[in-house]
């Protein structure tokens, strides 16, 4: 049975959670009146969702979207900061928004059709893949306010873009649009605005159709490639293969191929 995080179906919920097609979690930021700015309620909700999706064997991919027609997220709620409640915008385990530093194995896909700025951009950078429209925009304007992008943006952006482009964005506070982000490889799939969520869910479905253990271990090694030396990565790869080979799905793939049928993945 799919685990549903508590409190996300209340009328005043700031983050919505639903399961699509049995294997994809759709997470929707829903503070349109505040341009989906992150407050304590958002941070707690996202951390709860990370915990629930990681614990649920049915969930194989997560899509992070927005209910606002023009904004993905404006980042930190400055009213909360001005009121002395900055600490509430992060959680001990997940960091800013309960997500950017969260330990997780399952892939997250950001569906962006609008502005993803400051902490909103850092939410996108915390995801594994991005589906966006040409009118989407990504930026770290913190220096305009005497701040820095301390929720991962300053080191994740240079990994996601050519370093000189990232440095320009950080130093000038100027954003780039979805088309340019796609050209640089930051955006995986560029589609018309009305198809962003649909395409993100389709990408999630493609991932969910593969062997869950193999996807998890493959992504674990691929993510580690950004931080580890080659020798450590080899060990990481060997460990991942051992885990995949010990799973029930390891033999199911070849059997399904030989029997000319779709594989029946168990995730075990």
Residue ranges: model-predicted function:
Residues 45-47, 51, 78-116, 145, ...:
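An acidic, glycine-rich surface segment that forms the CoA-thioester-binding/catalytic face
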């Amino acid at each position: 049975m799919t685990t549903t995080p508590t409190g996300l179906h209340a009328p005043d919920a700031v983050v919505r959670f639903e399961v699509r097609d049995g294997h994809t979690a759709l997470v929707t930021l829903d503070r349109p009146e505040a341009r989906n700015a992150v407050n304590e309620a958002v941070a707690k909700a996202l951390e709860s969702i990370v915990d629930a999706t990681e614990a649920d064997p049915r969930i194989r991919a997560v899509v992070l979207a927005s209910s606002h027609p023009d904004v993905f997220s404006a980042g930190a709620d400055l009213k909360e900061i001005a009121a002395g409640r900055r600490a509430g915008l992060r959680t001990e385990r997940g960091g800013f928004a309960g997500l950017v530093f969260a330990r997780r194995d399952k892939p997250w896909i950001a569906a962006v059709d609008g502005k993803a700025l400051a902490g909103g951009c850092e939410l996108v950078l915390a995801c594994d893949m991005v589906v966006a429209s040409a009118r989407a925009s990504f930026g770290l304007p913190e220096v305009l306010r005497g701040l820095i992008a301390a929720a991962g943006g300053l080191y994740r952006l240079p990994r996601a873009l050519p370093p000189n482009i990232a440095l320009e964005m950080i130093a000038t506070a100027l954003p780039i649009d979805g088309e340019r982000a796609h050209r640089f490889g930051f955006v995986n799939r560029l589609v018309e605005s009305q198809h962003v969520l649909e395409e993100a869910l389709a990408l999630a479905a493609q991932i969910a159709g593969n062997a869950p253990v193999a996807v998890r271990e493959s992504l674990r090694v691929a993510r580690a490639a950004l931080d580890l030396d080659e020798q450590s990565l080899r060990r990481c790869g060997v460990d991942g293969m051992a885990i995949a080979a010990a799973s029930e799905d390891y033999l199911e793939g070849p059997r399904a191929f030989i029997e000319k049928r779709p594989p029946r993945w168990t995730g075990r």
